[in-house]
Amino acid sequence: MSFTVIIPARFDSSRLPGKPLMKISGMTMIERVYAQSKKSHADRVIVATDSKKIFDEVILFGGQACMTSSHHQSGTDRLQEVAKLLDLPPKHIVVNVQGDEPLIPPEAINQVASNLAARDSVGVATLFEPIGNYEDFIDKNVVKVVIDNAGLALLFSRAPVPWPREDIIDNKVNRISVTDLPMRHIGIYAYRISTLNQFVSWPIATLERKELLEQLRFMWYGERIHVDKAVIEVPRGVDTKEDLEDVIKLLTTNL
């Protein structure tokens, strides 16, 4: 199986500006994401960015990077620009590793690429893990996913879905069945180039605009997304200063 990892990275994050260049135990965040991606089975790893600062940092640590337009609506749009510049064939698989996932396990990258390669009838593959506490369930920054019995996505949302009416009473956990836990979406994707090209041709979907979740554009226009349980725990990415501090603590503890 052949696949490419592309890492979209923006400097102007609304919640934590400049986070790709923030230091985590002596390395910038983007270098850590790149290093984790290189441990996967990918043929090539490249950073897609509209920031000269990020571009220069990647070149400095010996990585590959590509400058992109600053007008993209999403990381997927940015990724498609680079895939087009690389002239990758329509059936080639690209894995989108977010630029704020410094602890992304290479096993998760390999898993999502393999899942897509094994399924010709779907255009996108991604991962989930169970949510075991109420705080994460109601957190709008924790994206939830609902799937059908074939492992295909029915819905992605920042809202607490599916709402377990009998398990949660007056905003308190009455009980949560271990066999029916809600699912946290893990923001890693595998696509075929042909699917990426379709994505950028579609207008932004109404639901995508409401939730600010670009994967909803695929579903809005009828593309199927396969969602599998991650074979390994995937730490949450860095959206806030608190997330950054948590990652630093985790790395320090494991030294």
Please describe what each predicted stretch is.
Residues 11, 69-75, 232-234:
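Short, acidic/turn-prone active-site loops that include or flank metal/cofactor-
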Residues 41, 61-62, 149:
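Short, structured coil segments at secondary-structure junctions
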Residues 106-205:
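Conserved core of the sugar-phosphate nucleotidyltransferase
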